[in-house]
Amino acid sequence: MDVYLDNAATTYPKPSVVPNRIYDYIVNNGGTSGRGAYEKAMLADGLVFQVRKRLAGLFNHLDPKTVIFTSSVTESLNLALQGILKPGDHVVTSALEHNAVWRCLKTLERDRGISISIVPANAQGETAIEDVAAAIRPETRLIVFTHASNVLGTIQPIAAIGDLARSRKILFLVDAAQSSGVLPIDVQTQKIDLLAFTGHKSLLGPMGTGGLVVNCEEDIHPLISGGTGGDSAYEYQPDYYPNHLEAGTLNVSGIIGLGAALEFLETEGLENIRRKRTAWWTTP
């Protein structure tokens, strides 16, 4: 019997409800979201919005319309970083970041003239809040941290960093690729302004799904521009969410699969799933 251990890359197998729900949508509906007023399109609209609501509930986010769907956490992080940072801005980040953050920051350093401070980690991969505070400058625009390292699995003190960032009026972006679906995340109490997540890891959804939770009033410049299904005579991207940051046809089948996975997680309970995982690693 094969044993699959590559869950930090993507989880497998998915709950059976995920492929079943995707198949049912493709075979029995197939309509696209935001592109029509006929029955199948309206049904697709409703299904997509239900997944926004489920994600908002999972992360204790107040407005489902500002749960933005993307193709991956990499796109979500690029959307936030490229959409916010301007020439002269300073960013504080950790030494444990994935290339989805690091390469984007280095590109912005080269192309836009931002500056970057890297907060070191100790031998256990832990970051001290005092070191984060010491890295802040007058021109610091944003702090971006991974919640859990994809290499070490170390959990970073995002609640403390969120308190620090909010007290200094600095935006706080969290990369929750490895933690969403594993650890409790509350964008309100942890003071997270922007939360980037993927659907295909511990949220148990299909590849090609991800998102950005926008929990702030920041004007984020769209990463791409294009059709949104409405305001077609307007020459620029609409200024309201989610259309402001979503251009092109959504991955409706993938989003519906992610919704099925979220239903599974709600039924099982995150804490119950965590206990099972812990038991696997601690059983002699």
Name each region found by the language model.
Residues 1-284:
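Pyridoxal 5′-phosphate
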